[in-house]
């Protein structure tokens, strides 16, 4: 059956706090946010800038914990400015047959303009006889109050 790329982690509507054109590539992100969705340092991410429509790929660097930092660096800094809202997501390569048998789970963290968590979702593919069922579960217990 082959392989399929499935989204496994997403930071939704995060707000750019800084843009540093003088840093060599990447996007710096608060490591607490990275951990919540399972993104690793140096992992490739796709980014959509909701404020201007730019779409680009880069890799992740961890910033300072609890800083709520979202800082595109290098060339990516030319595509964003502080205050822009971004969607940052990563894929993983999965065996299609295994997904149909065991399912798949993606974590989605939604933030407000201060990069505080407002929603946290587990998006799941659940195996069933004729394929998979998509479920979008909000996890209110995972949201800091």
UniProtKB/Swiss-Prot annotation:
Subcellular locations according to the entry: Cytoplasm
Binding site for substrate: 58, 74-76
Reaction(s) this enzyme catalyzes, per UniProt: L-aspartate + H(+) = beta-alanine + CO2
Pathway where this protein functions: Cofactor biosynthesis; (R)-pantothenate biosynthesis; beta-alanine from L-aspartate: step 1/1
GO cellular component, one term: cytosol
Cofactor section: pyruvate
SUPFAM superfamilies given in the database record: ADC-like
CC cofactor note: Binds 1 pyruvoyl group covalently per subunit.
Pfam families assigned to the protein according to its UniProt record, in alphabetical order: Asp_decarbox
Oligomer and partners: Heterooctamer of four alpha and four beta subunits.
Task performed by this protein: Catalyzes the pyruvoyl-dependent decarboxylation of aspartate to produce beta-alanine.
Name of the molecule in the record: Aspartate 1-decarboxylase
Native organism: Synechocystis sp. (strain ATCC 27184 / PCC 6803 / Kazusa)
Lineage: Bacteria, Bacillati, Cyanobacteriota, Cyanophyceae, Synechococcales
Gene symbol of the encoding locus: panD
